[in-house]
Amino acid sequence: MKNLSVVTQFILLGIPHTEGVETMLFVLFFSFYIFTLVGNLLILLAIVSSSRLHTPMYFFLCQLSVCDIFFPSVSSPKMLFYLSGNTPAISYAGCVSQLFFYHFLGGTECFLYTVMAYDRFVAICYPLRYSVIMSHRICAFLAMGTAVFGCIHSTFLTTLTFQLPYCGPKDVNYYFCDIPVVMKLACADTSTLEMVGFISVGLMPLSCFFFILTSYSCIVRSILQIRSTEGRHRAFSTCSAHFTAILLFYMPVIFIYLRPTPSPWLDATVQILNNLVTPMLNPLIYSLRNKEVKSSLWTVLHLLCFLPKHL
């Protein structure tokens, strides 16, 4: 007869096939994590401290920076903890929390990128009505809506995952608790969860991505009609930064959750790109080609580090 004792903790087995390089990975991922936190905090300070950047586009960029601070913080501290030689165990409640906040923040970012694409669509396709359509009230409503939908999405998935009984093996063949690896340990039929997870985690980002592509097809058409070369260049510069960030976010998600045959090592590698590298690159993507952000950022660095006021 099977042992039906309830699992009270899980063992995170980490990134597959990385035995012997834990110290190197710890230094690398810790550097990524620190750069992510510092970069996004600087973007936040740059936007908040400059009245010129108090517009809908930068308001949503602020929200993205907040998400990019917390998103890698869901899995990175625990991963760094066991890479430094500590216990890889995580409590049942800790596993639930990881899964919930990962999908809450991931879902919020997914909806937020869609809202940001809509903002650019209105700004470029309907410039005369932009201030009316994207009023402060509408922006606050959209920002709150992304978080609410992200929370509903995550609550639904977390409830479905952990209403299953876990009474057998407790080794999670991954570096954090996510649906595909946790549900393999359930002592019950997981076909319903697999189907719902595929629809929610796979098709939901795909639907948002198609909406974004539709918005950008309209944006490109409108940009090509701009007579001013400088105007076209500025519009393309702003939109290309946003679209680059979108690709870096959506491609790993679609790759991981819509691929029919999972590979633990490949999935973990792509997931790290999504969890650590993309949030680290976002501040660079949004600041390098944006003179206003760079100027405000330099002012913040001057105040913090006593650097020269001008480049």
Curated annotation (Swiss-Prot):
Odorant receptor. InterPro entries: GPCR_Rhodpsn (IPR000276), GPCR_Rhodpsn_7TM (IPR017452), Olfact_rcpt (IPR000725). SUPFAM superfamilies: Family A G protein-coupled receptor-like. Residues 46-54, 117-137, 214-237, 289-311 are cytoplasmic. Pfam families: 7tm_4. It comes from Mus musculus (Mouse). The lineage of its organism: Eukaryota, Metazoa, Chordata, Craniata, Vertebrata. This is Olfactory receptor 10D1B. The chain crosses the membrane at residues 25-45, 55-75, 96-116, 138-158, 193-213, 238-258, 272-288. Disulfide bonds join 95-187. It comes from the Eukaryota. GO terms for molecular function: G protein-coupled receptor activity; olfactory receptor activity. GO terms for biological process: G protein-coupled receptor signaling pathway; sensory perception of smell. It is found in: Cell membrane. Belongs to the G-protein coupled receptor 1 family. Residues 1-24, 76-95, 159-192, 259-271 are extracellular. It is a multi-pass membrane protein. GO terms for cellular component: membrane; plasma membrane. Keywords: Cell membrane, Disulfide bond, G-protein coupled receptor, Membrane, Olfaction, Receptor, Sensory transduction, Transducer, Transmembrane, Transmembrane helix.
